[in-house]
């Protein structure tokens, strides 16, 4: 039976690839169904012989307990946005300062969810959400139900690839029709529907909703020397790659493509929100490098946002964790980009003055970055009142005098004991990108603060289960889960804590770079600002901000209290080893290694202080080669770069 099951699995997987990836089926639907039913019958009779890559895994129901956290071996960066031709020109000018004659590749920006797929020996072992770029959620079982994701590859490869999982418009319409018939609320748009589907704990629901993917990058060190060749390689491996793309030599060609896509956008079978422009040559990408947040070799052009008219009803003023007071407009409800919008940001007091926004004005509302509702401008022809908006002079939270500094656009409360600032700081500390304390959201934080159970972040770690039971609506099971989540967060790597402290200008990426270098928050506390400023991709602004924060007596007390409660202050990721054998060297891995997995070789190189990259350039110091090294070895020899083999790496 095992032989027949092997034959059926191989046949059905091949037919599925022909249907979903190549759009060129070689058998009829009825023949596929007949073979599929035969396989199901055999697997039911011999469950111990079910193969890991059986297509029945895609439809079988399984109720999951939850989603485990998963550390990305290769971090996922955000892209810099561009909203105009002028911003694209500026991007091109920056690139040409480093790369004489760049060729660009333009790809559609799919409005879906970023995913990372890891294969070991050609078998799918992990499917993970983007998360914060460093840590995502393991949704492997759900992604196995996405029919165009290969469960196995035609080669026994160790490879990690990235892409977007989305819901086609036709599937979206079908899903909402079913929800309407069942009396359930409809999804606002395909992206929300895809996100909700991938968060399902019942995998059978995922299988029914017909999600799809486009893959766009080999995340593990690339085996090809350009983005275009990389995409073709992904197609060879059986992944679905979006065919709508071009190579361009200048911004004129890019702009023409953007205009063409904009005209076709509404007729596509899936949602897009822009065009991604990348330098095609991977060696040139390597030369350009990264900022703290984004690659310097790519930009995401975003299409102009949909705009609607709404009437301004009133303005709320709220205080953030840094003391900035932000105005939010209450509006007559309007439908915007698939959702109902009744509130929109007015940004700051200077923006209100610049746009001359007045009481009862009719305003144009849009979604900034297709996400945040914002007021764009006033429709002056529909103005009904000359009365200006009331600008507060006192903090809406603590009643302290508000200040409007000369070099700032916003009003600011500088009271360090302002309740709103403290509470927002606590919410930030517990958030996903910071300490990621599951369940400790704004509602619970507000109740804890109101009950005087927490006054600063150290108090969170003094809470006991019984404290949560004092809060309205919290039962024993929830209290136990909250307590467990707080205790678990003590073990986080220290960059999560550093970001959670909410130090001005110190974001999540900067926190990671700082801890990679200094290894612990205590070492960072002792460091001088010159050393901080010298770290690549950081600089003087972050150094000064850290110096100011650590100079306060309160910061020293807080760190001591956090340590006393058992919170980890050490970095648990791959550190930068200053005196290691390969410290500061840029190394490329290429070819097929005989004894080490590529991931093992990469980890060893990094543990020795090397920066491992995917392409050979003039910035490369060393190339480690295996069998069939190909063009990268040839380029290294042409550039006179030192070449070593696997045995040399093992000897270190």
Curated annotation (Swiss-Prot):
UniProt cross-references to InterPro entries, sorted A to Z: BRCT_dom (IPR001357), BRCT_dom_sf (IPR036420), DisA/LigA_HHH (IPR041663), DNA_ligase (IPR001679), DNA_ligase_AS (IPR018239), DNA_ligase_CS (IPR033136), DNAligase_adenylation (IPR013839), DNAligase_N (IPR013840)
Location of the active site: 109 (n6-amp-lysine intermediate)
GO MF: DNA binding; DNA ligase (NAD+) activity; metal ion binding
Keyword Ribosomal protein: no
Keyword check for Transmembrane helix: no
Species of the source: Streptococcus pneumoniae serotype 19F (strain G54)
PANTHER family in the record: CHROMOSOME TRANSMISSION FIDELITY FACTOR 18, DNA LIGASE
Binding residues for NAD(+): 29-33, 78-79, 107, 130, 164, 278, 302
Gene Ontology biological process terms from the UniProt entry: DNA repair; DNA replication
Protein name in UniProt: DNA ligase
Binding-site positions, Zn(2+): 395, 398, 413, 418
E.C. numbers: 6.5.1.2
Record's keyword terms, sorted: DNA damage, DNA repair, DNA replication, Ligase, Magnesium, Manganese, Metal-binding, NAD, Zinc
Ranges of residues in domain BRCT: 577-652
Pfam family, one: BRCT
Top-level taxon in the UniProt lineage: Bacteria
NCBIfam families: dnlj (TIGR00575), PRK07956.1 (NF005932)
Stated role: DNA ligase that catalyzes the formation of phosphodiester linkages between 5'-phosphoryl and 3'-hydroxyl groups in double-stranded DNA using NAD as a coenzyme and as the energy source for the reaction. It is essential for DNA replication and repair of damaged DNA.
Reactions performed catalytically: NAD(+) + (deoxyribonucleotide)n-3'-hydroxyl + 5'-phospho-(deoxyribonucleotide)m = (deoxyribonucleotide)n+m + AMP + beta-nicotinamide D-nucleotide
Top-level EC class: ligase
GO cellular component: cytosol
UniProt record similarity statement: Belongs to the NAD-dependent DNA ligase family. LigA subfamily.
Cofactors, names only: Mg(2+); Mn(2+)
